[in-house]
């Protein structure tokens, strides 16, 4: 199974890339975690937040593989525990196909993309820095994977 994190934004600090890579390489052969960065729309010069979100929406849609399960990260999404994420991961693995997690840009995501999501999920009700979200999401996906594999990484 392939899990992709689509994240609007490029040029993260080195610590973000290093932390993400640390979690991404921990998976076994049955799961691959991949990060795809989506170029953010430049703001200013007549480009409103709405126009920026629309342009980023088109880039995100183009990057989502057909038939992939879509999980959109949003601070108003469902508040799952790590165990609930593991249950979701187990269900997605059994159903076959790939999973795409989407992290929006500075101005958020389009309503259309949120409506298209199979799951609207939050890491926190608070707004978080995008680099931190990449790392936290990769960690939680790995934690869910470790729960399913009875690995001692996760403790209740």
Swiss-Prot record:
Sequence intervals crossing the membrane: none
InterPro entries: Alpha/beta_knot_MTases, RlmH-like, tRNA_m1G_MTases_N
Broadest EC class assigned to this enzyme: transferase
Catalytic activity reported: pseudouridine(1915) in 23S rRNA + S-adenosyl-L-methionine = N(3)-methylpseudouridine(1915) in 23S rRNA + S-adenosyl-L-homocysteine + H(+)
Function as written in the Swiss-Prot or TrEMBL entry: Specifically methylates the pseudouridine at position 1915 (m3Psi1915) in 23S rRNA.
Family recorded in the similarity comment: Belongs to the RNA methyltransferase RlmH family.
Name of this protein: Ribosomal RNA large subunit methyltransferase H
Record flagged with keyword Magnesium: no
Alphabetically ordered keywords of this record: Cytoplasm, Methyltransferase, rRNA processing, S-adenosyl-L-methionine, Transferase
MF GO annotations: rRNA (pseudouridine-N3-)-methyltransferase activity
NCBIfam families: PRK00103.1-4 (NF000986), tRNA_RlmH_YbeA (TIGR00246)
One of the record's GO cellular component terms: cytoplasm
Keyword Ribonucleoprotein assigned: no
Annotated binding of S-adenosyl-L-methionine, by residue: 104, 123-128
Primary residence: cytoplasm
Recorded superkingdom: Bacteria
Subcellular location: Cytoplasm
Record gene name: rlmH
Complex and partners: Homodimer.
Enzyme Commission code: 2.1.1.177
